[in-house]
């Protein structure tokens, strides 16, 4: 007898957000039900919430494609990894330039069936 497990996952890559600030929001929704997490993200005022909500909805739609119902889903894993940093220069006085690093991150959300 084989145990068939399907992976319900959505990933957002090269998102122009700080990894630390994104993790702060992801920790709030880990282990929650799908509908509850959507509600939490809708009313939080942090910048990453809008993008995380989009990725979570994408994962929910992936589950619908596999014939699962959204009300039975739970967020099994939600994590953010560092992406490449965009390097920019800020002109300063007397011909100098300061280097600015704009962070990116990769957000992954895994769902499981309740």
From Swiss-Prot:
Domain of life: Eukaryota
PANTHER family per record: CHLOROPLAST 50S RIBOSOMAL PROTEIN L22-RELATED, LARGE RIBOSOMAL SUBUNIT PROTEIN UL22M
Name listed for the protein in its UniProt record: Large ribosomal subunit protein uL22c
Entry GO CC: chloroplast; large ribosomal subunit
NCBIfam families (UniProt xref): rplV_bact
A GO term, aspect molecular function: structural constituent of ribosome
Keyword Glycoprotein in record: no
Stated role: This protein binds specifically to 23S rRNA.
Coiled-coil residues: none
UniProt keyword Chloroplast present: yes
Subcellular location: Plastid, Chloroplast
Family, similarity comment: Belongs to the universal ribosomal protein uL22 family.
Keyword vocabulary terms for this entry: Chloroplast, Plastid, Ribonucleoprotein, Ribosomal protein, RNA-binding, rRNA-binding
Subunit: Part of the 50S ribosomal subunit.
